[in-house]
């Protein structure tokens, strides 16, 4: 059991991502994140420098994307470990070059993970992200939008608006794009 949130939309970079950067971010999003013993990584993986970004393992090996063996986990380091959770489900779509959700279920701490990626990878590499990502969770009132402007992250929790259920209102809602709906909600003062 767990809680699932769905996402729609993406973040566009100020310049195209380098292929190596895409490969790294996508490998990072596929790995389980726990504190790792850097010295054991270096001893057990002769190619460890290829399995992190620019040869940097990061604090507690958090940037490492090589093979994940139980022996490299350092549970004693958990206090200083700063990854937001076990799974980061943001990735770079290789076809569009957009940062988006990878469709994995049960993505927790998604805003914190986005901030982690911006602070540790995108910003240091000179990438500025812009765009909107809408979210909707299993609970009726768990929805909103993440707006990113030049790597600054803003979130707007959604407001569930109930309409009388009739064909006219259904048609009006069906004609709104996500952007139009957001603009209309801002105009009406429902969100700011």
List where the protein language model places each region.
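Short, extreme N-terminal segment that most often corresponds to the first beta-strand
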Residues: 1-34, 191-192
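Charged interaction segments
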Residues: 35-37, 46-187
């Amino acid at each position: 059991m767990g809680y699932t949130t769905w996402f729609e939309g993406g973040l566009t970079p100020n310049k195209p991502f380098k292929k190596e950067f895409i490969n790294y971010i996508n490998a990072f999003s596929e790995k389980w994140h726990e504190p790792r013993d850097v010295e054991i990584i270096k001893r057990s993986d002769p190619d460890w420098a290829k399995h992190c970004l620019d040869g940097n393992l990061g604090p507690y090996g958090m940037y490492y994307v090589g093979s994940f063996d139980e022996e490299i986990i350092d549970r004693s380091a958990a206090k200083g470990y700063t990854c937001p959770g076990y799974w980061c489900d943001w990735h770079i779509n290789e076809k569009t070059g957009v940062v988006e959700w990878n469709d994995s279920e049960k993505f927790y701490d998604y805003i914190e993970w986005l901030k982690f990626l911006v602070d540790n990878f995108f910003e240091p590499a000179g990438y500025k992200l812009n765009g909107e990502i809408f979210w909707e969770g299993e609970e009726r009132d768990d929805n909103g939008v993440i707006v990113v402007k030049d790597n600054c992250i803003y979130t707007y929790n959604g407001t569930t608006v109930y309409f009388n259920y009739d064909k006219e209102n259904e048609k009006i809602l069906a004609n709104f794009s996500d952007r139009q709906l957001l603009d209309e909600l801002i105009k009406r003062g429902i969100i700011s």
